[in-house]
A protein has these predicted regions:
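Secondary-structure transition/capping motifs at alpha-helix termini
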Residues: 168-169, 195-199
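Active-site microenvironments in enzyme catalytic cores
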Residues: 1-174, 183-186
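Active-/binding-site microenvironments in catalytic and ligand-binding cores
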Residues: 81-82, 167, 173-175, 208, ...
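Active-site pocket scaffolds in enzymes
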Residues: 183-191, 198-201, 205-234
């Protein structure tokens, strides 16, 4: 799969590369989050250093819980996927961007996202969200047949991110909406299971960062600051 000239990435000899998706550090809102330690690669230095994270970030997401499992080798058809979703939560996919920048090639984040994921304490059922159902964005090119479903499958959910500095007042950093998501929850579940992967009741799936089309609607500091190039007023 890889170019023989670059068979090993520079981080291969420094980190036991892996990809991490885990439930052990999913915590409820209000649980303290400790700044993670890890390897970071500073500019103009040949080797990484072990350090506390210097670029701790949030990711504004939602998540959904599987309510009705599917068996191994029995994929969930996209048109019936919503019937297997119990409900939604708010989700903050905490991210250590400097750890992530060093470790993510070639498999993706590992320690950069494993230290905490915060979810809201209440699950909102899809029945309760029915009045907010709306049409999802147009998908071009048309998805492959296993990812197709008829009708509206997005939800008009207004979302905000506020940051309160110690001793200060909350400042709103972003305003966005769940309806901007390109892929629906039904498509996400259908794709997750299409290979035959089984799910269990209680499995949690995150939406990915929810960002809108305009500045001020981006769901992470990475995007809001253009990776540190643009200040954000707090």
């Amino acid at each position: 799969f890889r170019d023989p000239k670059n068979a090993l990435m520079p981080n291969w000899l420094e980190i036991p590369i892996g990809y991490n998706g885990r439930a052990s550090s999913v915590v409820v809102s209000g649980t303290p989050v400790r700044r993670p330690n890890g390897q970071i690669k500073l500019p103009n230095q040949e080797r990484p250093v072990f350090s506390p994270c210097l670029k701790l970030d949030f990711e504004l997401e939602t998540g959904f819980f599987v309510g009705v499992p599917n068996d191994l080798a029995d994929p969930v058809p996209c048109p019936e996927a919503e019937s297997r979703i119990f409900g939604m939560v708010l989700l903050n996919d905490w991210s250590a961007r400097d750890l992530q920048a060093w470790e993510y090639v070639p498999l993706g984040p590992f320690n950069a996202k494993s230290f905490a994921t915060t979810i809201s304490p209440w699950v909102v059922t899809l029945d309760a969200l029915e009045p907010f159902r709306t049409q999802q964005p147009r998908q071009d090119p048309e998805p492959l047949p296993y990812l197709r479903h008829e009708g509206p499958h997005a939800f008009d959910i207004h979302l905000e991110v506020s940051l309160r500095p110690q001793g200060g007042q909350p400042a709103t950093l972003a305003r966005t909406n769940f309806k901007y998501m390109y892929w629906t929850m039904a498509q996400q579940l259908a794709h997750h299971t299409v290979s035959g992967c089984n799910t269990r009741a209680g499995d949690l799936m995150g939406s990915g960062t929810i960002s809108g089309p305009e500045p001020g609607s981006y769901g992470s500091l990475l995007e809001l600051t253009l990776n540190g190039k643009q200040p954000v007023d707090i």
